[in-house]
Amino acid sequence: MSDSPKNAPRITDEADVVLIGAGIMSSTLGAMLRQLEPSWTQIVFERLDGPAQESSSPWNNAGTGHSALCELNYTPEVKGKVEIAKAVGINEKFQVSRQFWSHLVEEGVLSDPKEFINPVPHVSFGQGADQVAYIKARYEALKDHPLFQGMTYADDEATFTEKLPLMAKGRDFSDPVAISWIDEGTDINYGAQTKQYLDAAEVEGTEIRYGHEVKSIKADGAKWIVTVKNVHTGDTKTIKANFVFVGAGGYALDLLRSAGIPQVKGFAGFPVSGLWLRCTNEELIEQHAAKVYGKASVGAPPMSVPHLDTRVIEGEKGLLFGPYGGWTPKFLKEGSYLDLFKSIRPDNIPSYLGVAAQEFDLTKYLVTEVLKDQDKRMDALREYMPEAQNGDWETIVAGQRVQVIKPAGFPKFGSLEFGTTLINNSEGTIAGLLGASPGASIAPSAMIELLERCFGDRMIEWGDKLKDMIPSYGKKLASEPALFEQQWARTQKTLKLEEA
């Protein structure tokens, strides 16, 4: 009988690819690699007992198909001019997502697209003279751009009431309002999409182990030793992998740290929680059919942009408003209250201190949000829906976000980032994704960037297949309107977005 302890690692398995986390990012990369290298073996590890239970879960995010059609933080006003470059860039990336999803639907990898994507108009909303002027200027800057065609503008009571009856009821129209509207927006259930990806993965031979938490990643020559613990039995085992992707949400940074790669030195994470108001009145839910985004309060961070959102989840319409910010030291919704404190290292203390000194507005915003009760949250909703009643809404907890803090030189020492950040080692054998919005909406673009950075020597070989999956690969649709029109028509049909 062996003298080894009960929980000692068992005989090492091997895999070409280990994917950590059963969310939208890992499942997207897995699907992409199965298209490009179907002979590569893949193993997915997920600490929870099912897929898409953290940020990919449909009620843990707003489900916006982030194409910058309505999100005002992507079109800042600088010296009196609305800048659209970021919006165009995000829209380009969302077109890549549509093409990739369409290819997988055509290939039978993704099944019924209506389970995960549905047409919902995207609307930008402004109230008060300054915001109305901004909405008008934003509309003028975007309306003739090929990627934003079909956008309309209105600032009259009749049109507003026709399109947004819930928001019009009880409103004092002596205070000016304006909307820009585009019918071709979408609502996306990333949880359902993740499940479709992983169902197909299992059929194609990918091993998915739920209830397994990755505890460490260590280099072994050119490969990686991944130590995994069964959360139910306590047993541990090790897997040797050629490539590791850390798609573990808020836990990604610490896992990348355990791998010892220098590229994460000085990086830190700042956790931000969120709350939604979810409508419980079916009559009200049926009266609203749009995702309506407004402007964040002065001094508030981009994550606080308020929106009144139609959702389509498992074929049923829903309605939410938020998000309301909050704070907890947990890095995952199902994480530990010690997460933040465990993440502090000597090399990232300057980053934390630098951000603490610079981000007074964020601190003030979070304190204010944490102190809000239901009545205060309802007051914020009434700026959008004047006759909202407390009894028609319940508070639910959204997914946990960990904003990236990047190291910086003197005098800042650290900078708080509000997008997504891809980190990989110089050899391209391990990578991870950090950060938040626009996140899931641009997962295919993020994973293509990963392929280019980690598998650069294979990109020529993969070129034809990538163009088969994503016909606009290597091109900018903004400068090729004919290709955009062709792919738009194709994806509208394939994803069943033309159907009512």
Curated annotation (Swiss-Prot):
It is a peripheral membrane protein. Signal peptide: none annotated. Keywords: Cell membrane, FAD, Flavoprotein, Membrane, Oxidoreductase, Tricarboxylic acid cycle. InterPro entries: FAD/NAD-bd_sf, MQO. Its EC number is 1.1.5.4. One of its GO terms (biological process) is tricarboxylic acid cycle. The FAD is tightly bound. It is found in: Cell membrane. GO terms for molecular function: 2-hydroxyglutarate dehydrogenase activity; L-malate dehydrogenase (quinone) activity. It holds the Pfam family Mqo. Its main location: membrane. It is an enzyme of class 1 (oxidoreductase). Pathway: Carbohydrate metabolism; tricarboxylic acid cycle; oxaloacetate from (S)-malate (quinone route): step 1/1. Its cofactor is FAD. The keyword Oxidoreductase applies. Activated by lipids. One of its GO terms (cellular component) is plasma membrane. NCBIfam families: mal_quin_oxido (TIGR01320), PRK05257.2-1 (NF003606), PRK05257.3-2 (NF003611), PRK13339.1 (NF009875). PANTHER family: L-2-HYDROXYGLUTARATE DEHYDROGENASE, MITOCHONDRIAL. Belongs to the MQO family. This is Malate:quinone oxidoreductase. It comes from Corynebacterium glutamicum (strain ATCC 13032 / DSM 20300 / JCM 1318 / BCRC 11384 / CCUG 27702 / LMG 3730 / NBRC 12168 / NCIMB 10025 / NRRL B-2784 / 534).
